[in-house]
Amino acid sequence: GESLTAVTDAIREKFGIAAAIAPMSDSDVRTVVETPDGPLAFQHYFVRDRCEPCVTGFRFEGASEARPSPPFSAAFEGAGPKMVVVCPSNPFISVDPILAIPGVRDMLQASAAPMIAVSPIVGGKAIKGPTAKMMNELGMPATALEVAKHYADLIDGFVLDEADGDVTDAVRGLGLGVLVTNTVMKSLDDRV
């Protein structure tokens, strides 16, 4: 078969998407959710078990042998990106698997581009998915500040929702720039 990069590019082209889309890797990296009853493949945790088991940790099988995909690496060559944005996704199961691939964290830290993250937690709740539940089960408060702490060694700035404006100074105390704005897109006007 084709590589994930080739398949992703074919889908991008079919949908007429102009922007390049770079998968993290063409290698298999599998997220394993650790629970008191033993490890679960992420698909079993998320779909079969509907995120009900208590989370005690995560493993990213295959990450240590994986390499960044060619377009991912190419994005950091030459002048590199103008900016890197960590979207408001689950830090543990969406972003950490990418950071677990050897060389990715180094590429990000070596880049001259500013790097910002948008909080997936608004008012103590996840916008969607099990992020808040996972944070609580891992012994951390489900707050935007805790997400900022998770990324603090990697990012330059953090975007908070207006509902969490009260932690602005604490996030700045981590050495990060802060933007407080409406981050929740409820209507078409919000999305445009």
Question: What is the role of each PLM region?
Answer:
Residues 99-138:
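Redox- and metal-dependent alpha/beta enzyme cores, enriched for Fe-S-associated oxidoreductases
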Residues 82-85, 114, 157:
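Structural motif
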Residues 73-83, 108-111:
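Glycine-rich phosphate/diphosphate-binding loops that line cofactor/substrate pockets in enzymes
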Residues 63-65, 90-101:
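Active-site glycine- and acidic-residue-rich loops that bind
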Residues 1-9, 13, 20, 123-129, ...:
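Glycine-rich nucleotide/cofactor/substrate-binding loop typically near the N-terminus or early
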Residues 53-77:
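Active-site glycine-rich loop that binds ribose-phosphate moieties when present
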Residues 128-192:
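C-terminal functional extensions of proteins
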Residues 1-62:
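Electropositive, gly/pro-rich neighborhoods at or near active sites that engage anionic ligands
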